[in-house]
Amino acid sequence: MKKQTVKIIVAGAAGRMGRTILSLAYRDPAIQIAGAFERADNPSVGRDVGELIGSSPINVPVHPDLRECIQSG
């Protein structure tokens, strides 16, 4: 049976819980980080998710709202 990859979008990506979820998802081959978003005034907007979790860039930027996040992914 073929294993499926679950795509996730994380809200509050720059917060403590958001970073923890992103870090755990990054290490799990069954999960693909499809997007992440934060409040528009958060300094993490525009940064790569990999930077938030202390890894190399993964080409997933932090967006300022959910709609933009969904449209990009």
List the model feature ranges, each with a label.
Residues 1-6, 67:
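A short, basic/flexible loop-to-alpha-helix module at the beginning of a structural domain
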Residues 7, 32-35, 59-61:
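Conserved beta-strand segments of alpha/beta enzyme cores
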Residues 8-12:
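Conserved N-terminal Rossmann-fold NAD(P)-binding element of oxidoreductases
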Residues 13, 37-40, 65-66:
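Fold-independent oxyanion-binding glycine-rich loops
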Residues 14, 18-22:
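N-terminal Rossmann NAD(P)H-binding glycine-rich loop of SDR-like oxidoreductase domains
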Residues 26-54:
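NAD(P)-binding Rossmann-fold cofactor-contacting core
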Residues 51-71:
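Glycine-rich, highly charged phosphate/nucleotide-binding loops
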